[in-house]
Amino acid sequence: MQNIFDEVNSLDKRCRDKFDLSEDIMMENASISMFDYIQNNFEPKTKILIVSGTGNNGADGIALARLLHTLYNVSLYIPFGVKSPMAILQLQRAQKLNIKIIQKIKKYDIVVDCLFGSGLSRDLNKDTISLIKKLNSLQAFKIACDVPSGINTLGQVTTNAFYADFTITMGALKKSLFTDIAKEYVGKIEVANLGIQRKIYETKSKSYLLEKDDLKLPIRDNKIANKGTYGHLSVIIGEKKGAGLLCAEAGFSFGCGLISVVSHELQNIPNSMMQNSTIPLNTSALCIGMGLGKEYDEQLLLNDLPKVIDADLFYDTKILALLDKKNVVLTPHPKEFCSLLKMTQIADISIEELQNNRFEYLQLFCKKYKNIVLLLKGTNVLIGYKKKIYVNILGTSILSKGGSGDVLAGLIGALLAQGYTPIKSAICGSLSHTLAASNYKKNNYSMSPLDLIQEIKKL
């Protein structure tokens, strides 16, 4: 996993103060990183437009133009002039090389957005909005320097933003790149080296980007095991029976030794599963909430089993009694999380407000309920525990179907049953869920929850 930071100004200052890396040195390395990407991916003489703003992000772009000059057909567009000392200096250098500075945008193969960096904290004016619309309309490969222009420090887009195919962010990953809203704009992300290795540039962080290598599959390596060795997951079946059965199927596909469905009514269940009217005594983890409905036996909640809580329970105040327990994983989608925030008196907010501040509200919840692991579903999944947040950006629109969340609950429940910690269960369950969906080879609109389970078996 990689560190994610709220801001990097303090990291830049640390480099200047501790390692004597001047602003000029770091800027040169930033522009070299962008140059290397272009040189490694595009043929010489490709037509490139660099659009530079008034500050240091614009200065990065002007420095890039200097490096590309003569090797590529590069044009520099500076619509609002230059203001920062570094931008003025870089422009003076570019002018001495007679780099082409244009007044009108034409056709290009590559457009590099260097208008604003990660420090944008205001709304865009009309001229900037119009310019970004123009840039977005160009049929070109689009690269963003640091952060696509229009995305502010909180990862919000108040008017419009530059649609990048590739973002080269400076020094370290920023939280603003990983909001659900930002995902539409950032494309693929690469971190630019600013003159020292990232492990030296960076300090400790409380937010982390999950990667494929962070997935630890429940591989069986015990040669004298039996079915009880790998846990017993019980799934509570409610009014919408299909949801619970999908959860149970997913749990069985992910290494769990025994699966029981708990219901007072006879269910048509696979032969591999057991049915009980009460939670079996040897249960090692519990999944509850999927399709549960309003009428259920409250006694099912009154235990200290590790559990995954989903769906309908986020609208029921009985969930409050579980929030001080250990070994509990909550898996709400945004609407359900808004309900939970209201019930816990943390905030009474709209879904829109939540989506604009997902990190903030997850942190508030985890600060109040320190024993709980909360997985907030979304385009980018956020997993919060104590003071840390883990971000899974590997999800795709393939998962935007009913039943996908039931499968996720079963995966997490299966890992809990096998002895994984709640945070490891949430991380590995989420990664397996998204990676399995990414591996689906047919049309992205056709995957069913059962297809997803089949892909999980292939991981």
Question: Which residues make up each language-model segment?
Answer:
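Glycine-rich phosphate-binding loop
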Residues: K104, D109-D123, G289-Y296, V381
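Internal gly/pro-rich beta-alpha loop/helix module
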Residues: I110, L115-K204
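Nucleotide and nucleotide-moiety/phosphate-recognizing core
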Residues: F35-C114, D123-C145
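Active-site flanking residues adjacent to catalytic metal/cofactor-binding acidic residues
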Residues: V112, C145, I309-A311, P332, ...
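Short gly/ser/thr-rich secondary-structure transition/capping motifs
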Residues: A94-I101, N125, P148-T153, D214-I219, ...
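Small-residue (G/A/S/T)-rich helix-start motifs and N-terminal tracts that mark the onset
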Residues: M1-L71, S75, L177-P306, Y315-V329, ...
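Residues at the C-termini of beta-strands that transition into short coil/loop
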Residues: F80, I105, G171, N193-G195, ...
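A short, aliphatic-rich alpha-helical micro-motif
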Residues: I105-D109, A161, P280-L281, L323
